[in-house]
Amino acid sequence: MSSSTSSSSPVKSTGLHVGAIKPGVAKKDPILVADGVRRQFGGLVAVEVEHVEIPRNAITALIGPNGAGKTTFFNLLTGFDQPNDGKWSFNGKSLAGVSAFKVARLGLIRTFQLTKALGLLTVMDNMKLGSTEQRGEKLSASLFPFLWKKKDAEIEDKALEILRRFKLDEKKDDFAASLSGGQRKLLEMARALMTNPELVMLDEPMAGVNPALTESLLEHILNLKQEGMTVLFVEHDMHMVRHIADWVIVMAEGKVVAEGAPDEVMKNPAVIDAYLGSHQDIDLGTVTGRVTLPTLPKEK
Amino acid sequence: MDFLGILSSSVSFILAPTTLAYALATLGLAVHFGFGGLLNMGMAGFMALGAYGYAIGVLTFGLPWYLAAFVGIGAAIVFALILGIPTLRLRGDYLAIVTIAAAEIVRLLLLSSAFGGVTGSADGLSGFNGPGGTITNPAEGAGGFDQSNPIPAGTYGFPPFLDNERIWYLRIVGAIILGLAIFIVWRLVNSPWGRVIKGIREDEDAVRSLGKNVFAYKMQALIIGGVLGALGGLMLAFSTNVNSSVYVTSLTFFLWTALLLGGAATVFGPLAGSIIFWVLQAFLGLLFPALAEVGLMPFSTIQASQIKFIIVGFALVLLVVFRPQGLFGNKKELTFVK
Amino acid sequence: MRTRSTMRRRIARLASALSAFALAFGALAIAAPAQADVVNAEMPFKVSGNVQNQGKPVAGVTVTLTGAAGYTATVATDADGKFVAGVPAKEADYTVTLDETTLPEGIAVIDNPATTFVEANVQTVTVGPGGRATMNFFIGQGERHTTSFVDQVVQRLISGLNFGLMLALASVGLSLIYGTTGISNFAHAELVTFGAVATFGLVALMGPGLLWLAIPIALILSAGLGWGLDAALWAPLRRRGMGLVQLMIVSIGLSLGIRYTYQFFIGGSTEQLPGSDAERFKLFGSVTLSITDIVSMGLSVILIVAFALWLSRTKIGKATRAISDNPSLAASSGIDVDGVVRIVWIIGSVLAGFSGILWAYFRPGIRWDMGGQILLLIFAATTLGGLGTAYGALVGSLIVGVLVEGSSLFIPSDLKYVGALVILIGILLFRPQGILGRKERVG
């Protein structure tokens, strides 16, 4: 059943860290650095990350049992939620207090666990929305088509090229609502590419995706790295993590409990503990990646 | 029973100033809700500010009518800003309750005797379209909206559009404003700006994650729709007196009915919806009492004249349940976000 | 033949003249099919007058009007010494009280020899069939008559509690419905009106002596209405999985339809229930209370306690709370969600209906849009307490009730609802979970 075995093994980036491997280890060339980021809901501490660095031009997986605070951490990093405490920076620029849309403009683009394809817009309009260069989006310019028509044609060409890669070009005039769940995931990723991002953060890109599509999704993620982008993704599918990730960060109960290359980190007792602590019914084999995990109830 | 007379009176509402006023305000709602997804239930407040701003501009500040009109529009913009800055981050149904409450506050302030000297309190304001001048100095009037009418006195047209020069002037001014408004809205929603606004309607977080300043776009939509609402109120004020009892919550609900009739995410739907709404209102409002009078309906004529409102209410229910895209909307492009 | 064609021409001319009339002058009338239908009671009639000090107008003097069973309005004189107040009914008596503390130092109302009243600053006017009445006050050197501030505060507080308890009956129902179905039910106002209108109809049918029987029957009819609306409309829409926004607009349409149906049957005037003119007796100082006030508050408390017991003790009550907390979890743990929601509609309608009967005594009077007048206050109370939490709605209602009644001590009484609406907006902005609600987790 596992779909990724058929593709040839991707080239892993190695030597990303500096010094001994431990949670919060420094990276040679970090793109994103978080320090003391804490988010509390009432009495519950959802995220408390002391220090973490995301390596540039590599694929990093963020894993952990349900309720570990992965999605909340994503929200905090991208400005969709504000932490009670802490600082974090992207390319050396502090993102504390920067609103979500400005974070996106800096080149840090995210997708959502529950896909947010804009259902009643066409696939092409979804793509065009990703572009950051259209001055016709300004109210003052929008009334004068001669100011934006040419740019719109350029954007459309670029969108078509990306859509072709994602095999969505035939659907370009359909409403996004008519796509399948997997196609919507693809569309969301394609749309993110329209913004020319530096760091792409994918929240469970494989969740709910038809097995027939997983392979192409994996390839697209690997392509991002080849094109010089950095990828950080949350995933429950350990098989996928082992297959494509260069680096793995493990979260449990809001904290980073382990880091390392995929094969090593899976053997780390802290990781096995974290998973066993919350899912004692799960066979250790699934955790270490020999079997695909059963579909777990999704984090809110 | 004079069926032809009833029909002709009803048809005359196609070009009535009130219909044009409704169409303008409904177009504003289309920008808010149909394209921007903003659940504005306080359109009556925007209309009231447009109408009262104009009337007060003439009567209290002694402005010429065309400058006073901008007082009304300016008041609506300020209202949109005050309302929007804190509320635009609220969930849809919360926004609905906040806007309805804000519009009621506007109405209660206009009704209160505390500001009666400026607003006329329960009596409302009148005489601002005439040669007028201010309340305190009626002599200095330089000529108001009525005096700007270039059409010579007389009766023009053919039945059922046989009317005097004032009505024709109102129609022409209204049609020009509405035509311009429809053109601008059409341009806007078919531009990249419109694409962003429609994206926000579908999922504002997704649009935010693509680097768009969602708040600014929503605010722009709120202001544009609010100005259209104020223009609707202005149109009502051009044609008659202003009174706070007009700008009640029901008015907003009637606008919503007209909007959903025509199709919320369409540019011409608001006009079509307003025409249908008013022609039907007039038709039923004349037909039922006439039927009651000749004994074909077992009610008093007063009761019969109220049936049309009952029909409006239940028609709104049926529309939302069975034809949410409106009479002219695209079935696929249902405007309701889940 | 000839006469007929002239007739037709004449009719045509008449019709076109009529339509022109409708266009030119009727726009206002047609654009205002509902007069002031929300929050502020319609006050079509007027009491006005002058306050003069030896022929010169006195501005800023507070004048309070009171009328049958609870009507009060406070207005101030303008620069010309004039005051105007709207009153709810014609052919009725109103007491006009001039607050002498608002007069300049050293002067008071001169005893008017034309009246037999001892206190010259308290006068009675009769609004005749014309709907207008005048009451002039003449000021000069003299002694003042004062109502102590404490008395006023106590009076407002009692009135506010009464109003708040009445609101609570309506808002706990709205809150339960919101909690279990997610509907912001605008038609709740019509459920409120229904109780009063049904009682009125039954009294007309059975005679005023059977009021004690009419009220329970009206409540049974309310229950039937709630059941019917859910069975015929809301349950099918729920099964279709209709979105919350659509449901809200459906409730708006329903509200308009039902409201005008009431108007169709009872007309546009204000009618009274038997006992609304009950005498007021003096509690202490100038604080007065009527027997209907006491009965009204007593019954509210009994009903609210019964409701709280139902919600906390019975199986269905517990199921209701479970659904409010987490509908899908409740459904998967074997609770019959549809059945419970049906019961919630029935109970919500009965409470709203009873609240309508009390509102008819408090306003006083029955009108086709009486529920709509307090709908936003009910929303405010529900929101203040935390949307979907029944106990919160109770607390919120009491706060809104006291606030609305108390605020007229400080601001003009025709603005007393504004305070509550401002609070509604403020709560939605800064603490949408209400004072008793829990904060939702984001993300």
Placement of each model-derived feature along the sequence:
Chain B
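Transmembrane alpha-helices and adjacent helix-loop boundaries
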Residues: M1-K338
